[in-house]
Amino acid sequence: MRISLVLMSLCVFCCTADAGVLNFTGPFDVANWTQAMTNGGDGSFDLTNAPLSVTLFGSDNGFAPIASDTRFSITPTTGWFIGFDWQYSTADFSPFWDPAGYSINGVFTQLSNDAGSQSQSGQVRNLLIVPGDVFAFEQRSRDSAVGRAQMTISSFSATVSSFSATVPEPASFIPVAVGFAAFGVRAFRRRRATQTR
């Protein structure tokens, strides 16, 4: 009985153990991300503090309202849960004109608050990215004028469970086999004990 419990605990521990990435390293190294500006914007990126943080600067080159995005994107080949802290500021009249956030496959999720202060911050945790998703940090500008906004991403982390990988490693099946063996031994002993009574 005790051996079965130990084996089951070991199985649960091994199956839920995560491979982790801290900051912009490994598969999330800044060299693996794509930098893009849309619609002729003059946004930019500051990677000098990488791997600890990256900063996206929005566009501010328009004399007429021109929407433009500054986008920092990656397409992982493995499923990940990611987390990060974000800090935002704008020199525009209002955060409304320069929303910041992230997108998954082009679907934008705004983090900055249009009605909030010129400086804002927050954190995102346990955001699921599945293999093949295009994930991007985005600093948008609705007018590309009157003042530039920026968003800094720090404390980036990513974890992947052995079961969320695209192709499970053979080693990940070992804890499962051990768990099934423990249940089998326990069931066999119970059945045998019942028959001898």
For each feature predicted by the language model, list its residue ranges.
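Bacterial N-terminal signal peptides
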Residues: 6-13
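Mature extracellular "passenger" or substrate-interacting domains of secreted, surface-exposed proteins
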Residues: 20-166
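Positively charged n-region of N-terminal signal peptides that target proteins for export
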Residues: 1-3, 169
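Cytoplasmic C-terminal tails of single-pass
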Residues: 193-197
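Sec/Tat signal peptide C-region and signal peptidase I cleavage site
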Residues: 15-19
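Hydrophobic alpha-helical segments, especially transmembrane helices
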Residues: 3, 187-191
